[in-house]
Amino acid sequence: MRVVGRALLCLCCTIASLHAADDFVLGGTLGPSWEEAAAEAPVIDFDSRPGWLLPRSVQTGINVAAGSLERGGFVVSPNAQAVLRLSTSVLAEQLARVVDGNHDTAFEVKDVVATGVFLVLDLGARFGVDHISFFPRASFRTDFMKGYVMSVNDGVFGADIVAASPDKLPNRSLFTIVGQEQGNSRDTVDVRFPLQYVRYVRLESTQRFNWEIDELELFGRGFVPEAEYLTVPLDLGRPTLWGRVGWAPERTGREGKSRLVIRTRTGDAPEIDDSWSPWSAPLTGSDEQIQSPSPRRYIQYRIRFESDGLEDGMAIDSLSFGHSPALATSTLAEVWPQSVEVGQDTTFTYAVRIAGANGIDGLQIDTGAPVVQVRSLRIDGVDVAYTTEPGDTGLLIGFAPQQGDHLLAVDFDTAVLRYETVLEGRLLASGSDSLPQRVVAGDATTQLPGNDLSVRVPLRGFDVLHNVELTPGAFSPNGDGVNDEVVIAYDVLHLTQAVPVAVDIFDLSGRRVARLSPADEASGRHLSRWDGHDDDGNIVPPGLYLVHVEIETDQGTQRSSRSVCVAY
């Protein structure tokens, strides 16, 4: 497999600062062309819009059978070998003539007495087709097919059976007949039918006469329903951190009827092997963080176009992604303990072993819940000074810039709110504009018994709403700036995606007086505030009120209530 970018990127690295973040642009007018960077692009159009990447669209009068073999398609005849007494290689060579565009060659079935010889053409992709034509060479006009049955398969229904058994007798029931004639008198056969997706064509002779096919041609219109583009491994010249990826899309046809699916994988070898990462989950939109492992030297993109209709398509002008040199040669990180009670603040030790640090002065840890306290930071077993920036779902801890090999260990208190929480971490170098470097889970130190970054909690039933608390228990919304509102805190546990949560205020008669803004919320610690006003904006009378928290999950509705006093 070819590799793109080594000379270009090595030059860029020499003129850039050591930790500078940069952008790699593919396509458009600024970077390597889409065609230059292509490893596979069987039904991609590079020509109609220079600099753009788009799926092939069938134009009127263009024969889509041409190029079938180059796209990975085939032409086979499961029963011709016995009839014609040809070797496998010679038969394959002769069958290929029906799509080679050479009018001096043909596939011939002559001087035999058998009927029912048929061939199957795989276009290598699905196309919108409404017209199929076949004919003999001009110098053999009388050797046309005197009887035939033509049928097609759309590449979806039973297509796996057809594709898996091209050298056997494909089941006729998997094909739909679009044309047949027992007494054909035309040398050029044109079969026309309603526009539809076609991938496989089955053509059978039903008469005992000499015949040949110069070309089997298919015509139609519209975008192919699926098209995939695969880059060669893009060489960044050295171990690299990945940033965000963006692209400039353009849609043709109906909104929502065409899609773009982009995945990445990374490695350190120029050829794809077992050391490369698997394909990432699809990137859901432009300006999303690349999730494939780093630092790695090479990255590969797979871009898939999908369309729900012949007139619906999508194109992209260019694709760019951020990258910067690695902040460390390698990392290993683990957390302890790895099994705790749900929703209870626990002291954790987060250890990171760093090899080849180059100016690292920060560690960011995702916890999923607020960090209550940072207790200490140790570098190589020695307590050191640090700064902290706690957040609602994590912690940023800063320290003096580090070079070389070190073991970092930070102790902090937080709660775990879902069954398996991964405490991902990133190394930072604030003295540069380098991208963060994600730490890799592993055995960072023998002082901790774990070897990964996952923390689990016991699963006891399906309760997802915990620790509903009101602060203060009584408040006076009189506008003096003191105790003017109540803060409603609650934990949502065990969820893998956001679900509807509502917070309502009721008086003691059961009448709802206020609904706080409903929202979809995932696992985490959440806060709502009530300022003592009803839904009409009026201050409620003094008295006791019920705060009602309700959450909707696929296991049903869960509720919890607390009381609060409004006083003046």
Q: What role is predicted for each listed range?
A:
Residues 21-460:
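Beta-strand-rich ligand- or partner-binding modules
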Residues 3, 225-226, 552:
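Beta-sandwich/jellyroll recognition modules and their flexible linkers
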Residues 12-13, 412, 555:
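A detector of low-complexity, intrinsically disordered, Ser/Thr/Gly/Pro/Ala-rich segments
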Residues 1-6, 568:
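Positively charged n-region of N-terminal signal peptides that target proteins for export
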Residues 404, 455-568:
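Short loop/turn motifs at secondary-structure boundaries
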